[in-house]
Amino acid sequence: MTPQPRPIPALYCVYILRSTVRHSSLYIGSTPNPPRRLSQHNGVVKGGAVRTSRNSLRPWEMVALVSGFASSTAALKFEWALTNPHTSLHIPSESRLAFSTQRKRNGQPKRPPKSLSSILSNLHLLLSVPSFARWPLRVHFFKRDVHAAWGRWCGKVERELRGSLPVVTDFGEDEGAVVARASASEPLGVVGEGLDGDGGGEEVPTWGIYGLPLDYAPLKEYVAKGQDIFEFERQGSCVVCKEEIDPEEGGLHAVCSNEGCEGVGHLRCWGRYLLKSEEGGGEGAILPVGGRCPRCKGEVHWGTMMKELTLRVRGQKEVENLLKVKRKRAPRKKTAKTKETREEDG
């Protein structure tokens, strides 16, 4: 049975892990849930990796990650290239920074030793190669020294990254923002769903990986707008080609992500329009990055628009969970038995 296509995940990232005991020990992985994955690496929850299982190197910390991957397959492709920059075909031979000087018993090139500088330099390289340069990715740094090392490399290399590539820092130590965990038994690094903030239990940071949205909540208003437009057939005409959109004809249609704008257009029209509006006219490119809506003139990002579109056409269950109205729990009624018990205790 052929698996049904899924919507673009709320979050899927490739992360860099560092031992807090020995900073030279590093690990690269991918996950849709960084807090849970960090708990696994630290042995708090089952499911870590062999290379991070040594207690002498624990605890580990996530010092940086790249988010915005459209699927687990896309993230794994990037992870493999970052782990094996000496053999990855995504890196042109003339641009390669990592080289193997030894071979394994099977004759394959042996992976060169990793260092923070080598990982960051190859990360910078991968973000600029044709395979990944136009993906809707975002780079996050959670440690000042790692971000400083990134800055030093960017300052010395000639190859520049795409100007619209977001690089975000969230060090958090100075903010001191914390939230109460649901219970003391919930392990550090596992963010509970539906925390009510009543207090009690241990505290979990709200910065760094714990501040990343793990669900579609940031898109709730956008998704609701798209559902409303198509449910009540308010598509109107394409914002680009001006052709009337027939609800019966099918096809894929993207919606402007800006609040208050209901601009809808054919997917191919949006793509051509955004590519053409780029500097140089998007010459040779297939995948748009972003631009401005032809109706409201507000900024739009292709990755965000595609996430809403895939939710609308492939993610019925996810949309229902996102838009359902949460009922407030009714106050518990006092029973006669409870009253009698309290009187006996008092």
From Swiss-Prot:
Cofactor: a divalent metal cation
Leading EC class: hydrolase
Compositionally skewed regions (Basic residues) per UniProt: 324-336
Record flagged with keyword Zinc: yes
PROSITE patterns in the record: GIY_YIG
The EC number(s) this enzyme carries: 3.1.-.-
Keywords: DNA damage, DNA recombination, DNA repair, Endonuclease, Hydrolase, Metal-binding, Nuclease, Nucleus, Zinc, Zinc-finger
Tagged with keyword Nucleus: yes
CDD domains reported for this sequence: GIY-YIG_SLX1 (cd10455)
Cellular compartments per GO CC: Slx1-Slx4 complex
GO biological process, one term: double-strand break repair via homologous recombination
Compositionally biased region (Basic and acidic residues): 337-346
Residue span(s) of domain GIY-YIG: 10-92
Region (Disordered) residue spans: 324-346
Zinc fingers typed SLX1-type, residue spans: 238-296
MF-aspect GO terms: 5'-flap endonuclease activity; crossover junction DNA endonuclease activity; zinc ion binding
Function: Catalytic subunit of the SLX1-SLX4 structure-specific endonuclease that resolves DNA secondary structures generated during DNA repair and recombination. Has endonuclease activity towards branched DNA substrates, introducing single-strand cuts in duplex DNA close to junctions with ss-DNA.
Subunit text: Forms a heterodimer with SLX4.
PANTHER family xrefs: STRUCTURE-SPECIFIC ENDONUCLEASE SUBUNIT SLX1 (PTHR20208:SF10)
Family as reported in the entry's similarity comment: Belongs to the SLX1 family.
Listed name of the protein: Structure-specific endonuclease subunit SLX1
